[in-house]
Amino acid sequence: MTRMDAKTPVSTTLGVDRRCFLGMSASAVGVACLPGGYPARSRLLQPWAPLFEISLAEWSLHRALRNKELDHLDFPEKARSFGIAAVEYVNSFWKDKARDAKYVAELKKRCEGEGTKSLLIMCDGEGALGDPDEQKRKTAIENHHKWVEAAAGLGCHSIRVNAQSSGSYEEQQKLAADGLHRLCEYGDKHAINVIVENHGGLSSNGKWLSETLALAKHPRCGSLPDFGNFRVSDKEEYDRYLGIDQLMPFARGVSAKSHDFDEQGNEIHTDYARMLEIVVGKHAWRGHIGIEYEGSKVSEDDGIRATRKLLERVRDAMQAKLDERAKAAGKDGK
């Protein structure tokens, strides 16, 4: 594995003062901090800061991890080898280690050594938070407690969960909202947010999920909008651009799903320029956007690099437009 030292440049783009972005987005919102101080989106942006930072979701390397070509503890170093200094974990790659204090401490030490920030843990296989059976729902909530604790130990801001349930549209909303609210109450004890990804079933319906998050009525309950997970069923595909737009008001993170690329380096299933205009332009997102490569036509490493390059290219184009407008505004003001 090629190791990049602390001086290795990470993904950033320089440009004019981002404060000028305020007047260029009709829907720009004010400074908003989540519990624990994590910024959801900022109105007053720091000079020379990139429009958004890039993180790496561990799922991008799921084949290497499953084939024992990469150890979970080496993920921070692997991310740094791509010039990425923020990571998003997947619980299935360290399923029995959540309450292993030494293991969590070692992982945190590895991150600190690489200059890598832990953002969140994606949690699967712990039961349905919206299970119609009260006892099963309670068990699912409690099963997630250990990941809340692990996230706190690593310095994450959130755990990502699923809003699985069964029943009618409204019944599933009520059940999932109940489970989410109760888990968020535990998150309060550790300053950890509980965020839901559009991840199959009704959760891939942006309207249903946004309504469910509102119904949960807890400030720690948010979303992790994923560019590609909008298949509600084998017969129903939800509009991904509409879905992202509906989920962004609740966003605590953003997942840039990628599969395949054309000769120009564009993702062929998602128009990244259009998507980032929604995320960054309309909703003024200023947090990390996480690479989640899931394709198979190129290697995982190459897929990660291609996704990063695409994100940077679109980000640079957006920044160039802002710079031009800022210069024009400056001339008009003279």
Predicted regions and their residues:
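Active-site clefts of carbohydrate-active enzymes
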Residues: A256-E263, R286-E300
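Acidic/histidine-rich catalytic cores of soluble enzymes
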Residues: A86-V87, A177-I278
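Short basic/hydrophobic patches in alpha-helices and adjacent helix-turn junctions
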Residues: R274-A284, G295, R313
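N-terminal pre-domain/capping segments
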Residues: D5-G153, E171-K174, H181, D188, ...
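A short helix->loop->beta-strand "cap" motif at the edges of active sites that frequently abuts
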Residues: T116, I192, H283-G287
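Active-site-proximal loop/turn and secondary-structure-junction residues that shape catalytic pockets
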Residues: S60-H62, N91-F93, D124-G127, R160-G167, ...
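Active-site groove signature of glycoside hydrolases
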Residues: A151-Y169, H190, I195-H199, G290
